[in-house]
């Protein structure tokens, strides 16, 4: 039986202890302390900077144990994870120490108990590499603490720690089941499975195995059995994410879970070749997911920590976010290495909903060391992660981390941390693919703006139609958050204009990455004029994000099968940002950009390849018309292409009886016309079609050619 304790917290600063305050488990102790002393809403203004004064402090969770037990039962302290370096003490006696936040532990404390016992979890200050720049994420490059906590362009610097996962006292009988882990192998036809259970228990156990409809398929004391005519687990859009159910039980204990049968491989992209002439190099790194013998176009997003306080994330939040991905026709999340691991409930939900998971380890944008101390912690944490996730059908890819083969990280395939992670994935989950980092050769990260001065002021429509990557695994277009959300974070005296005021900067509108990130006011002025209210800038940025992301996703789909993936940066955010690249605002609010992505990721649709976003009277407007299909059936349809200019509709094309084979695209005809001089600020290309395959594109139109030019831009 489980007994949840009431905890108090203590801050230890310069050797001095604070008064005890109420601490919640799961949770983060800095949040509890901030609430106790009155830091205020961490989202508002600059309140979250108050937590910086706590970075070098130690903390203690303390409880007077409360439980009931029979004489025949043992007593255990169980924790799913504590962040980050800590000791566990019973009655001031240290019984366990660990560095890391992802490894669970369970401690038999029976013989240490007196009947009036104090349990303490003592947490050391946050790891900071000696010599690293103060306040910089380089401080995280010698530890396994997720570096996002040290500050990112969408996450404030907020070093948190504590009992972020569930913890409890548990009484156990002699027949307690300590381990119960199923595994399976499939025959070549993938219609028969051999299922095995690894069980640790002092007495015999009964295994029951059910299909999703609760029909009993096997029951007995054997730990291995065969199943005929099995159903496979499929990702969203490709079939049913079918999950079998199991129980393992004896007279006093019972464990249960689910199991999905699937086979996954990472294959070389069709259309990629080694160089034609000598001297030769290799072809681009393989990056096509094959699920159950079927090549899948990965369409999804980068998932980041859903809260700045990781202990507050619960199953409800995870389910809201995963449901949004499913409804947006996505089939994969990349769990970015800077934030890395989620709680168990997230993976359970992805299993159930059919969202594949590309899981990165906790390395990102840093040069991680080869020294034995770091490698020892990394190995322990990585093994815990692999063992926790290898049973999940949704976890289809492991990665060493984010952007480790780039100039700002400087690692390589000879770096010991990445070699270690590869060996661990092979040892503990060898049938799931592993890559050392993203991007690999051939893959692309970026860009992160609609209009980029470093790309000769080309917009994303121009940039991506000329790109040719095997996968676009990060790209983004920012937008400014809603005015209602801004009122929750920006003081009233600053909200009337986007400026370099501290709250705007702290919430990532100005100087988050480049000086203009992420509000990108220069881009908005370029397209819409120098003057504009905050409300107008919000609408303008939403327009750019919507059309930009739609264009990129559809372009990546047109490049299938050479291109195998499109994942925007990013899906969600951990707090209310003033401006960001996310398509779901905190906590789980879809943006207009989200709905544009949802439309772009429909299984089948007509699509237009448009040369650029902004047009003027007298321009020769052109567009290629395509039929995109990543469904598993041949599709048929007809489309009428119309250009709406002001209140005038200009018919451009009728494409009748268009067809596309399963998971194949068809290129149709091109359309063109000379744009007249009309009184309008936009034109809309309309693709009228039946069967939910319609589409439209709202583009900027200017009658006059004089526009505002940002400094340094030639017109």
Label the model's feature ranges.
Residues 178-180, 246, 258, 383-502, ...:
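Active-site region of glycoside hydrolase catalytic domains
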Residues 11, 15, 159-162, 398, ...:
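Substrate-binding clefts and catalytic carboxylate motifs of secreted carbohydrate-active enzymes
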Residues 1-333, 558-559, 563, 589, ...:
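Secreted/periplasmic carbohydrate-active enzymes, especially glycoside hydrolases
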Residues 106-107, 132, 138-140, 147, ...:
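Active-site mouth of glycoside hydrolases
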Residues 84-86, 127-130, 267, 305-308, ...:
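Flexible loop/turn segments at secondary-structure boundaries
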Residues 57, 317, 377-381, 413-417, ...:
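Soluble or luminal CAZymes and related metallo-dependent hydrolases
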Residues 82, 91-93, 100, 112, ...:
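An acidic- and aromatic-residue-enriched active-site/binding cleft used to recognize and process polar
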Residues 105-109, 150-154, 453-462, 550-554:
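Short alpha-helical segments and helix-capping/turn motifs at coil-helix boundaries
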């Amino acid at each position: 039986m489980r007994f949840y304790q009431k905890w108090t917290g203590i801050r230890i600063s310069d050797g001095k202890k604070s008064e005890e305050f109420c601490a919640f488990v799961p949770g983060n102790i800095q949040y509890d302390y901030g609430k106790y002393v009155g830091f205020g809403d961490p989202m508002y203004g600059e309140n979250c900077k108050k937590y910086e004064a706590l970075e070098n402090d130690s903390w203690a969770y303390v409880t007077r144990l409360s439980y009931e037990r029979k004489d025949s039962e043992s007593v255990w302290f169980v924790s799913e994870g504590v962040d980050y370096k800590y000791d566990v003490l019973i009655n001031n006696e240290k019984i366990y120490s660990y560095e890391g936040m992802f490894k669970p532990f369970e401690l038999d404390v029976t013989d240490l108990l007196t009947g009036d016992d104090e349990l303490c979890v003592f947490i050391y200050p946050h790891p900071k590499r000696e010599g690293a720049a103060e306040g910089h994420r380089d401080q995280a490059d010698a530890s396994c603490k997720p570096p996002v906590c040290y500050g990112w362009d969408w996450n404030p610097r907020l070093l948190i720690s504590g009992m972020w996962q569930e913890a409890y006292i548990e009484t156990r009988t002699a027949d307690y089941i300590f381990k119960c882990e199923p595994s399976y192998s499939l025959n070549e036809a993938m219609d028969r499975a051999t299922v095995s259970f690894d069980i640790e228990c002092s007495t015999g156990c009964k295994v029951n195995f059910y299909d999703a409809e609760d029909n009993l398929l096997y029951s007995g004391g054997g730990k291995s059995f065969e199943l005929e005519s099995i159903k496979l687990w499929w990702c969203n859009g490709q079939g049913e994410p079918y999950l079998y159910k199991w129980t393992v039980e004896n007279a006093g204990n019972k464990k249960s879970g689910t199991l999905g049968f699937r086979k996954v491989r990472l294959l070389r992209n069709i259309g990629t070749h080694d160089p034609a002439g000598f001297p030769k190099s290799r072809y681009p790194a393989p990056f096509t997911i094959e699920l159950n013998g079927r090549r899948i176009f990965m369409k999804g997003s980068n998932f980041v920590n859903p809260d700045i306080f990781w202990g507050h994330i619960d199953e409800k939040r995870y389910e809201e976010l995963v449901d949004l991905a499913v409804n947006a026709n996505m089939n994969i999340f990349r769990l970015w290495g800077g934030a890395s691991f989620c709680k168990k409930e997230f993976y359970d939900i992805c299993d159930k909903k059919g969202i594949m998971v590309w899981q990165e380890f906790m390395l990102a944008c840093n040069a991680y060391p080869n020294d034995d101390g770091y490698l020892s912690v990394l190995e322990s944490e990585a093994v815990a992660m692999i063992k926790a996730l290898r049973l999940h059908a949704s976890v289809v890819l492991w990665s060493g981390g984010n952007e480790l083969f780039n100039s700002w990280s400087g690692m390589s395939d000879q770096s010991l941390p990445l070699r270690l992670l590869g060996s661990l994935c092979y040892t503990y989950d060898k049938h799931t693919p592993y890559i050392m980092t993203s991007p690999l050769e051939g893959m692309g990260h970026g860009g992160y703006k609609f209009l980029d001065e470093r790309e000769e002021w080309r917009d994303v429509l121009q940039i991506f139609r000329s790109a040719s990557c095997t996968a676009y695994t990060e790209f983004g277009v920012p937008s400014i958050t809603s005015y209602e959300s801004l009122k929750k974070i920006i003081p009233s005296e600053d909200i009337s204009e986007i400026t370099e005021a501290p709250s705007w900067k702290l919430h990532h509108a100005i100087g988050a990455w480049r000086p203009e990130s992420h509000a990108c006011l220069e881009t908005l002025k370029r397209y819409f004029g120098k003057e504009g209210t905050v409300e107008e800038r919000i609408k303008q940025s939403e327009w750019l994000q919507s059309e930009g992301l739609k264009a990129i996703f559809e372009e990546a789909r047109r490049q299938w099968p050479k291109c195998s993936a499109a994942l925007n940066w990013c899906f969600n955010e951990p707090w209310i940002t003033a401006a960001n690249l996310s398509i779901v605002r905190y906590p789980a609010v879809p943006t207009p950009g989200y709905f544009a992505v949802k439309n772009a990721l429909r299984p089948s649709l007509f699509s237009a390849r448009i040369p650029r976003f902004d047009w003027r009277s007298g321009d020769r407007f052109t567009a290629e018309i395509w039929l995109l299909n990543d469904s598993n059936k041949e599709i048929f349809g007809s489309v009428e292409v119309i250009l709406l200019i002001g209140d005038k509709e200009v018919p451009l094309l009728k494409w009748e009886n268009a067809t596309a084979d399963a998971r194949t695209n068809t290129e149709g005809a091109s359309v063109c016309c000379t744009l007249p001089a009309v009184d309008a600020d936009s034109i809309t290309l309309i693709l009228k079609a039946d069967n939910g395959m319609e589409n439209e594109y709202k583009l900027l139109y200017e009658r006059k050619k004089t526009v505002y030019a940002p400094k340094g831009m030639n017109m």
